[in-house]
Amino acid sequence: MDVPAQVLRDYLTANDLEFEERDGSFSFGLPGEHKLQTPVRVDVGPHTLAVHAFVCRNPDENHERVYRWLLERNLKTYAVSYAVDHLGDIYLDARLPLVLVTPDEIDRLLGSLLTHADGSFNTILELGFASSIRKEWEWRNLRGESTRNLEAFRGWLETGASPEPDQP
């Protein structure tokens, strides 16, 4: 367990990622564009490196469509899979045998994790929080408030249409 933990520790340090380490677990954040930061926990176990990343809280609506979209995305991911916990919160999860823990493989794994956490974020919001986003948009426009952080949704908000995200 010492060698894989050291490989991970060295990787995080070399990439200027601040982390906390406790009892074989590493916690850190990966910066994104759509999702400002993805919280990640990596557990170094006796046989595997387990990676867990929080993507989004339990959607307010449209659960079946959100979960179906995530399951379809699982067919196209490298090393990571979408999962939900008992509260319905959405995660990306991965397992890597310790014998495969190298800086290059950690880079591929975390790259895949960030690509999918960040790249899916707006679609998950569109599918699972459209009503809340629409209310926020209307409230801000009525009061002359900035809608800058809602720009990704402007198209369907201005037309009054339902969001139609790209296929996975």
Where are these regions (language model features)?
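Short, surface-exposed charged micro-motifs
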Residues: 16-18, 39-41, 81-83
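Short solvent-exposed loop/turn micro-motifs enriched in small/polar/acidic residues
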Residues: 12, 33-35, 74-76
